């Protein structure tokens, strides 16, 4: 495919892909798909390289959409979720400073199949950050600017990311700004304690007020409420925002089509949180 500079959705924009691509390494089915929006053939009709070179003849640009009807015994709805856009937090500098990234982007950096093959490197210059700051609740529990609910997963994946950083960057310093640590699961509290006590992650209870760049460094300004709201200023090489989880676009429409319940935030609702946590109110449809 000649179109090789399309930002990769799976790598959260940190890498590039072609117009014909496998969505991600463990995709099921593990088959290539064509991005019609960026495919040169669909845009101007002047390309057809992949159709000519496909060894199995599986690509047919003239193929039209068709409706398929299948009878099944059960349906499992697994649509996942999205992360909240960070545009409403201009004081954090996301989109303005290349080294302010989201937790999902850090996850791809830490992955062996990611754009840096598992090495933690700054998007701006490819250097290894020696000091990193994680900002928890970047949008969660904030009715004024974000969403009112707790996303539930941010505390734990932030602790995991901080531990991964300490394991990969020996001698590096990591800081986590948090409101409260909500480690509600088996051995979750012990996991966070291990990050603090064994891996040396510095937890600061307080909100970040502003992030700006100075002399090639990111200046993170906040407060430490455990020290009487004392001002805290950290000169960091990279900042990671634990952005809030929100329902997928179109989740409400899908729920109405399938006649399943959903909450005010468009998340699908289970039949009973304790007795039937994976069943919906419609028989045969599961979450």
Q: Could you say what each language-model-derived stretch is?
A:
Residues 1-287:
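Residues forming the flavin
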């Amino acid at each position: 495919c000649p179109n090789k500079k399309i930002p990769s959705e799976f790598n959260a924009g940190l890498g590039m892909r072609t117009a014909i691509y496998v969505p991600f390494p463990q995709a099921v089915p593990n088959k290539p798909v064509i991005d019609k929006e960026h495919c040169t053939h669909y845009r101007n009709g002047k390309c057809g390289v992949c159709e000519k070179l496909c060894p199995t003849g599986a690509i047919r640009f003239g193929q039209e959409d068709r409706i398929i009807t299948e009878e099944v015994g059960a349906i499992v709805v697994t649509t996942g979720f999205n992360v909240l856009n960070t545009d409403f937090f201009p004081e954090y500098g996301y989109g303005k400073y290349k080294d302010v990234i989201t937790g999902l982007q850090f996850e791809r950096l830490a992955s062996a199949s990611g754009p840096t093959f598992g090495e933690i490197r700054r998007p701006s210059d490819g250097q290894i950050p020696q000091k990193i700051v994680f900002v928890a609740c970047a949008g969660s529990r904030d009715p004024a600017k974000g969403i009112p609910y707790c996303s539930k997963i941010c505390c734990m994946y932030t602790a995991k990311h901080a531990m991964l950083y300490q394991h990969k960057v020996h001698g590096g310093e990591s800081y986590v700004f948090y409101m409260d640590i909500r480690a509600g699961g088996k051995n979750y509290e012990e996991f966070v304690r291990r990050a603090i006590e064994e891996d040396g992650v510095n937890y600061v209870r307080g909100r970040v007020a502003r992030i700006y760049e100075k002399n090639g460094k990111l200046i993170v300004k906040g407060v430490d409420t455990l020290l009487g709201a004392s001002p805290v200023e950290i000169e960091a090489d990279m900042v990671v925002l634990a952005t809030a989880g929100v329902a997928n676009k179109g989740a409400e429409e899908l729920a109405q089509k399938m006649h399943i319940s959903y909450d005010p935030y468009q998340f699908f609702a289970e039949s009973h949180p304790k007795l039937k946590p994976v069943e919906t109110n419609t028989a045969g449809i599961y979450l």
